[in-house]
Amino acid sequence: MIGNDWDELLKIIWESPGFKKFYHVVEEEYKHHTVFPPKDHIFEALKLTSYKDTRVVIVGQDPYHGVGEAHGLSFSVQKGIPIPPSLQNIYKELQDDLGIPPAHTGDLTNWAREGVLMLNAVLTVIKDTPASHRKLGWERLTDYIIRLLNEKEEPVVFILWGNFAKEKAKYITNPKHLILTSPHPSPFAA
């Protein structure tokens, strides 16, 4: 399903009757609504960042809900799409704190390839309807992913922005890992 070590780690989930039933509901949502990201990008974060290579996890809430924005990575948008305010604020903090100049694109694919798992807690959303799939069942999978990452021997940095993401800290108990929390980067959260 993914094409890397996540397949074996998540096999127990993929093969469970509960997940199959849940994923059927997701497929029905795609048939009857405009849903983002495109279906072939739902698991893009896992495809681009293997379990073995994950060094940083940035937890988002759910995908952007505008046309052409979401492509399976939290806080990231496809090339050619204007940089969203949340990501502009992330870039501003990187510049202010570390002197890293802001990127000219909102596509964070390179971050993912370098070991930053850009994981939304909810992996799909209906067009123009934020949080529309929040109660659908994605969090069973994504919470399990966070618990698997907690088991890693190598230290992992978990970046939890906003109250929604901070709730995930309860799954991170390994003292080797670092949890960084702060308000959500959205200008509406300030």
Question: What feature does the model see in each segment?
Answer:
Residues G3, K11-L160, F164-T173, L178-P183, ...:
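A polyanion-binding, active-site-adjacent surface
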